[in-house]
Amino acid sequence: MLIVALATVRTRWAAFAGTFAALALGVSVIAMMTLVLAAASGGNVHQRPERFAAVPSVIQADPNLQVRDRYGSADSVPLLAQPDVPASVIARLPGAIPDRSFYAQVQGVSAAQPALGHGWSSAAFAPYVLTSGHAPSSDNEIVVAGSATVGSRVPVVTAGGSRTYTIAGTVHPRTGEQPIFFTDVEAARLSPGVDALVTYDAATADRAAALPGVHLQVLTGADRHEADPGAVQDTTELTGLTTFLGVAALISAFVAVTVTATAFGLSVAQRRRDLALLRTIGATPKQVMRMVCADAALVGAGGSAAGCLLGLAGAPQLASWIVRQGLAPSWFRVHFTTGSVLALVVAFLAGVAVAVLSVLVAAVRAGTIRPTDALREAAVEPKRIGPFRLLGGLVALFCGVAALAAVALIFPSAATDQKTEAEIVILLIVGTALLSPFLLRLLTRPFGRGTAGMLLRASILTGARRAAAAIVPVLITAGLAASILGASDTANAAASAGEHQQAAGADFVVLPAGTPGLTAALVDRIHSISGVEATAVTDTNMLVFQPPITSLHLEAPIPIPFSAIGIDHLSAALNLKVTAGSLTGLDDQTIAVDSSWDKHVGDTMRLWQPDGTPVSLKVIAVVASSGLSGPSLIVDLHNAGAPMPARVYAKTDSGASAAALLAAVRSQHARVVPISGWSAAVSDQQAKQNQVGLELLLGIAIAYSAIGIASTFLMSTGGRRSELALLHMTGAIRRQIVWIVAAESLVLTLIGIVLSAVVSGLVLGALYVALTGEIGSVSIILPW
């Protein structure tokens, strides 16, 4: 039968062209996603060190929190900020050179790269070489990178405020940062914490690695990049990208597998006469099954190989697009490693497996059916759908609807999780696709009026499986787009509305302009304005051992991050509805939680600041939940771990105080925005960021589905040559035949859109119920 399979593929290559193209494109999608996912999972191993390129060893505090989980096993949790090197370690390593990195920027000069200040002794680590002038010799002198006039005086902005310095010299710029070098004494004043220690002595590095009671990492070789500015942020971005690509790969694989399986199933259905003839002339069931599976394996191997080559070519382009959209660090690239080879092998095997499994059920049926029944089914397609298809469709629909009900009524917080959305939509689409031959009888009734309509409906129902194969790509394309985009837009709008409830009492918000935050001097100036009540706010995350509750009412075994805001003090500008206790006494020893936590006033919570500093805080207040993306914890600015507040909410009592606020902020690297304008701007920015991600998530999948639609319709039409020829022989003219084919394609497309609208309606309806229960009235936003 292998010889027969080879001959079949060779002589009927045109019949297999559609399935080959569908499989090649499907495997290319899977290969691209897995290659980029493998590159993101590999972290920054391919990035060369920049700031510490000229030193052999860099000593840092461990960027992971070392804990024991609830089962007593050692575990580590990535920290949200790089911790400082403990003072005790510095004292025990006298030969190591301290390195400090902190925000510092020449006023009025935009920073294309991170603007950072260092002590002059750190310049040799890169190395930075003087191109003019001399090293800073007093605390009011600096050295800058690039072109500048030596001897000129410039204002420099740091977290504390602005101060004028004299440019003593310049150095040649390097990639990765825009540095300003101070004297070591001035750098220590501006940033007391030590970010890293540098040693040229191997013995000192070994001693640091063996120090008891502390968790340090000694970086050498390519690992020195982990100490570069922004390395923690790069790791965070790659972690988020890995999570996101996992969801994207899930959806892309689903689309590829479904469209490919549909194409292969249709190709087998179009060969019913061949298979019936083989059974009639004496071919055994096993021989027929082997032949069909061999056909699929041959086409699958060729299509998978072509798809892997396309994936190899497309993965670097996809990675470049991800970088341009700001979803990954600027240096992120696809490097071909052992992980890449494994990704290609997985994509290839997945393609062959999909091809064989897609025809397996049809092959079993074709092989086991009696010859006389095979001839009858070859002439007229059976009207009933198979029991396995019926059972699979019902189970998938039941699971999808049950999951929607659970999200809407029991776990509304899961409504905004993209992975949950994708899984539910996939279940509903799979169930609807499997039951589509049965649903066709109901949905084609409106088209059965009149002679032409009756002929059209009869043509569709006679080839119900063929028609269902044409519906599936339409269902996937429209269903995914409407469900996931609509759910995302709706959730973003609802979450944004909830987030801005905290600023409902403010008239204005002060935002940084060209700086990473607001300086302490500016915040103090705003607080000193008569008639202005203000609260400085920064967004952060705190690691907490015990989450409020999981979907199964279990405690998480390790600390996980929870959103929080840090505030400097309470004012009328901050709108937090207190349901128990009071926020008046909020300080560095206390905390407030929202109502989702099972905590009461007087309880003590064990937390970790973003840099891993452990704190035990007393709950002094419980506040109402402020929405799906609002903070669940409220702490003071010290515990927030951010040196510069992100914004200041300000409430003015008169036009004069508003004018004073504007005057105070002028020329202070900040801007004043009316609260309504700020809410809209932030909402638009959040929507844009989410939209970029969803374009990546759905763009490839929808494009592939569109190709699948064209391929399936071409295969369906090509398999009806004898039927169309019979119509022509009975008197139908060419225009009438074209009208019948076009009308049938249009009707099937409309049915696919209707089914996708039902799926989207179920998803968005459940989302509406979930969001209404969480934050009140919401509006469903459709993606058009």
Q: What do these predicted ranges mean?
A:
Residues 14-22, 240-243, 256, 342, ...:
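Alpha-helical transmembrane segments, especially those used as permease/efflux helices
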Residues 308-342, 405-420, 755-784:
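Short helix-loop junctions at transmembrane helix boundaries
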Residues 8, 12-15, 256-300, 369, ...:
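Interfacial "coupling" helices/loops that link adjacent transmembrane helices in transporter permeases
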Residues 426, 435-595, 603-604:
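Juxtamembrane segments of multi-pass membrane proteins
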Residues 150-164, 601-617:
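Short conserved beta-strand and strand-loop elements enriched in small hydrophobics
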Residues 3-6, 10-11, 15-16, 20, ...:
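Alpha-helical transmembrane segments
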Residues 241-244, 326-358, 380-396, 693, ...:
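Conserved transmembrane alpha-helices of multi-pass membrane proteins
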Residues 2-257, 266-269, 291, 501-502, ...:
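Membrane transport/envelope proteins' first extracytoplasmic loop
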